[in-house]
């Protein structure tokens, strides 16, 4: 290993956080892990139908265990996030976690046309992650799909805010771009398409809004050769549904 970008950062961040559960790994991390395992097993394909995969600590390789996989017997009913999200929105309560879950669940599924059009614009999702760790300081990208359009790949770091946008959001997005450029792009060549999604600003004539737009333009100028211009998307509630709109600034 000659460079930090060769490390499997998703697994390292998982250990640093000390959490248990599902941890998403990127496409290139999955491919690399698969090849490492394949090499360790002398490129022998394992036929483990109706058996469980296990690890032989003595031989230091993956084996087929003579026992059947466990069946999941927990809750299976679908959870409808939208009513909870709308209730919190109307009550003025925090709902960023619900917004993140809604986008992660529905993006690219054809269930919210405005969501798909503003973020994907006809592209296909090849990978989708949320709470993507991107630094030893425990920073995490809210949602990050990798998409394909016209044979061109783009990685889309999305910053979500359940409130109106402000200038500080650009600082966070800049950190995402820095990390992706240093650790993700060397392993998976892609365009970088930063996106900011926030609650709709009704009055766009204020001095604060002008400052916000100026911060977007400064970001675009300083990162012109590194990523695509920032896409600014606002959401609102229309007829008991979430509506997303791309803002021209």
Name the predicted role of every residue range.
Residues 1-8, 184:
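Structured alpha/beta reader/binder surfaces that contact nucleic acids or chromatin modification marks
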Residues 12-249:
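Charged, terminal alpha-helix-loop-beta segments
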